Regions:
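Bacterial N-terminal signal peptides
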Residues: 7-14
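Hydrophobic/aromatic beta-strand elements that line small-molecule binding cavities or substrate pockets
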Residues: 33-35, 67-68, 93-100, 123-131
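A short, structured loop/turn motif at beta-sheet edges
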Residues: 38-43, 72-73, 99-106, 128-137, ...
Length: 176
């Protein structure tokens, strides 16, 4: 019985995305997460473009990830529609803009996510896909630099946690 519990624990731990703050200074930081999914690079690429199906609702402005879209082409928008409040107009947020779209290999966005937009920060958000035994290895990286009130190093662990959570959402969605 103990052998089976240990095996289950090891499987659970290995299934979680490996995340880490790689570097952190008052003027910037780099975070990276990795996960292997049981999907082809083509299937993984397509799911990146269906971001509203796997991004966490709690990390949106509208409260619904279904309001998000990500166009998988250079110049494409990583945007969120904001529903109208009462009789007022609807709104929108550009979370990022696609800089590089290399199908099945790499997607890079200029994306000062969330609270970084109101700081003097630049953010590069990328996913690299590599065929691996039984699926695809995804490396998700976010690099930010510039001025942040109180220091960017204070933001690094928060961004790392939030983005690792999104990679887990992508992994879960691809497992269906």
């Amino acid at each position: 019985m103990r052998k089976y519990l240990l095996s289950a624990l090891l499987l659970t731990l290995s299934a979680q995305a490996a995340a880490a703050v790689e570097e952190s200074t008052p003027s910037g930081f780099s975070v990276r997460s990795r996960a292997t999914v049981a999907a082809t690079p083509a299937e993984t690429w397509a799911m990146l473009g269906r971001i509203g199906e796997w991004w966490n609702d709690e990390h949106t402005y509208s409260g619904k990830a279904a309001n998000m879209r990500l166009e998988l082409k250079a110049g494409g928008c990583f945007c969120e529609a904001l529903p109208a409040r009462s009789a007022g107009p609807s709104g929108s947020i550009e979370h990022g803009r696609v800089l590089t779209a290399m199908p099945y290999d790499m997607l890079v966005l200029d994306a000062p996510l969330g609270p970084l937009q109101s700081q003097a920060m630049v953010g590069r958000f990328s996913w690299t896909l590599r065929a691996a035994a039984g699926g695809t290895e995804i490396t998700q990286t976010f690099v930010a630099g510039g001025y942040a009130r109180g220091g960017a190093d204070k933001l690094a662990p928060i961004v790392d946690k939030v983005l690792a959570e999104q990679l887990e959402g992508l992994k879960r969605r691809l497992a269906r």
